């Protein structure tokens, strides 16, 4: 039988349960680095951070800070009740490929217009992602 243990957060620690719904967008100047197959495929200090109840923060990277030559359109799409329709990318570096590993909102709903064409990745599908020098565990 699994025991349920409630973890108390530290005063300076964020909790996904404190994040808002609908989601909030914040500018982030943290150094974001995304590495796939040993290659830095995205790096910025101009990300947008989206916070939503029960979800880890998502960092959206400006397209000009992404090596888009490593990204190709994927047939997958999803719909967020707040942000609208998301399109997906497959990432390929050398002989290594990850399908549906990144996404973006081509035409997000009005409150989220600042996210248009910014790219987010699934950290678990990359070699490593860093946020402010700290390895992402999401």
Please place each PLM-identified region on the residue numbering.
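Terminal leader/tail segments of proteins
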Residues: 1-138
């Amino acid at each position: 039988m699994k025991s349920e243990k409630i973890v108390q957060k530290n005063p300076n620690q964020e909790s996904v349960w404190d994040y808002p719904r609908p989601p909030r967008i914040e500018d982030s100047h943290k150094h974001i680095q995304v590495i796939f197959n040993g290659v830095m495929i995205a790096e910025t200090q101009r990300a947008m951070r989206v916070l939503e109840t029960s979800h880890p923060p998502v960092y959206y990277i400006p397209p000009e800070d992404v090596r888009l030559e490593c990204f190709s359109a994927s047939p997958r799409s999803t719909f967020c009740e707040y942000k609208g329709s998301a399109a997906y990318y497959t990432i390929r570096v050398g002989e290594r490929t990850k399908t549906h590993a990144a996404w973006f909102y081509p035409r997000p709903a009005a409150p989220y217009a600042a996210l248009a064409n910014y790219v987010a990745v699934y950290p678990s599908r990359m070699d490593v992602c860093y946020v402010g020098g700290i390895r992402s565990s999401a």
